[in-house]
Amino acid sequence: MVASVSQQALGPSAGPIVSRAFDAKPPTAEREIDRKLGRLHDHAREFARLGIGKKIELLRDIQQRTLQVAEEWVRAACRAKGLSMDDPVSGEEWIAGPALTLRNIRFLIRALGEIQTRGAPVIADKKVRDLSHGAVAIEVAPYDAFDAALYGGITAETWLQQGIDRGAIEGHQASFFRKSDPQGGVSLVLGAGNVASIPPMDVLYKMFVDGNVCILKMNPVNEYLGPFFERAFKTLVDKGYLEVVYGGGEVGAYLSQHDGVDDIHITGSDKTHDLIVWGPPGPERDDRKRRNDPVLKKPITSELGNVSPVLIVPGPYNDVELRSMAENVAGMVCNNGSFNCNAAKMLVVPKGWKQRDAFVQQLSNVLAKVPPRNAYYPGAFQRYESLTSGHSDVRKIGQGNDRVLPWTLVLGLDGKDESERNFYTEPFCSILSEVSIGSDDPVAFVKEATAFANDRLWGTLSAMLFVHPTVEADAGGKTAVEAAIRDLRYGTVAVNVWPALAYALCSTPWGGHPSATLADIQSGLGWVHNTVMLEDIEKCVVRSKLVPTPKHVYFPGHKSVHRLGRRLVGFEAEPSWLKVPGLAVAALTG
């Protein structure tokens, strides 16, 4: 049976409803919400003051229960998205669902243990680097010896805001655990509908980093996951520390304005955020923004999407490198059917780049081998039509139908056209656009591309640069690239790798750049994951080799990513060196 769902239930910016592979849950009644919030309020102070050892016990309990529901969870997600459990692409659901949730739990257990013994998550002095602009960078990945073995080619740093020196780091870390008399509070988490690990990981952050109890409202798009989360977090529910509710925009609005909610975290769209914070569009909202008088009178943090740029710095790329870059970009586009806030959405290439046509052909060849996916997220077909119509060079790759959208390149946009909607509209569907700017001089291009990404593209979540080793080896090139990493106003800046790794590594912070404001929210404010519990963060910087060996698991065509994903779930639940060879074999046979 496929249940019908009203447009209103999904919220104001959801778009048309796609057919469902699951029965819709009835919205939680207001009186039941009142009861749940009252119960949470009664236990908020108790949870805030719970000993660290007790919180570690709770996390270990969640860890085991998450492992127990993992296969059912993945099966439900695959069914909803039209995937076969036997298809390698189902590995996306293993990895982006229970595996990352378990990794987050594992790192939180370590962090709490270090707080218990040392007062804060441990940061070795050798992991701290002074930056030229008066800030510090803390290496947070590899986070442990397992990370070094499994992801040795990837490094990540958390950059703190300018003016915080290495001697002051501990004062900008784990502040909740420095409180002598915490009162706690009730946090509302408005769950995302696209990636299965987002709701539970947002809950974990609000509870075990911020110290609040939580009410999680499931998104109607993936509300089928709610019962698995309730089972995985059962002990928290039983103790009055967590509640899960269901419904669309009306339930979200009721919760957001409820006196029993102290603060809010939302993963969704900027339109939904502004509706909550400023009220419906119109003169009254505009006036409220001018007066800085939001309707919402409580704190809100958010992660709201992006027109994610990929900047290709010119360099002497050979055929192997161009092929790897094409696979990299295709993976960033195709993962989860392109319904990711960090999916590659705007190629920014040098004007006059001699390898441009060869790269586009390589990318087209890779995409042609990836079967198009169900466009399961509401509004995808309408956004697709809006962002492809009126453009002169639109290349559709693969066949679409009433459920499937083809991978699509929208090429040759005019970088000077301030009205170009692809620059300010997040596609959240299978589109990748391209624009040529600047020149084919690496130093000049990097400077112009940074300004273009900052000033012309919507969003502040994540950006990526492809950089050839010879450019980094050149003093002028390296200086220009490092300046771009510093100056790009994005919460994550990645070199040669998908910025989504900052989401997946968990020791890294994930969120929009802090330059946003409540009135101009861009990709949101605040951070999640961040198991090192750093505060006053500027951004995360992730780096990898131009041609990774083995290939990153998100590259299309990996033949064993479903087996790798299943093994990762078991590993993250109970890590052991005995499990590493099996993971390596699964990765290498892709």
Annotate each PLM feature:
Residues 315, 335, 341, 349-461, ...:
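NAD(P)-dependent aldehyde/semialdehyde dehydrogenase
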Residues 210-221, 241, 296-315, 329, ...:
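Short loop-to-beta-strand entry elements in the cores of soluble alpha/beta enzymes
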Residues 186, 220, 235-346, 351, ...:
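Conserved NAD(P)+-binding/catalytic subdomain of aldehyde/semialdehyde dehydrogenases
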Residues 57, 402, 446-559:
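C-terminal core of ALDH-fold dehydrogenases
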Residues 2-172, 218-223, 232-237, 581, ...:
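N-terminal Rossmann-like NAD(P)+-binding subdomain of aldehyde/semialdehyde dehydrogenases
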Residues 198-250:
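PLP-dependent aminotransferase-like
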Residues 50, 57, 84, 272, ...:
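Catalytic cores of nucleotide-enabled group-transfer and carboxylate-activating enzymes in metabolic
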Residues 153-197, 201, 208-210:
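Active-site-adjacent "gating/activation" loops or surface patches in catalytic cores
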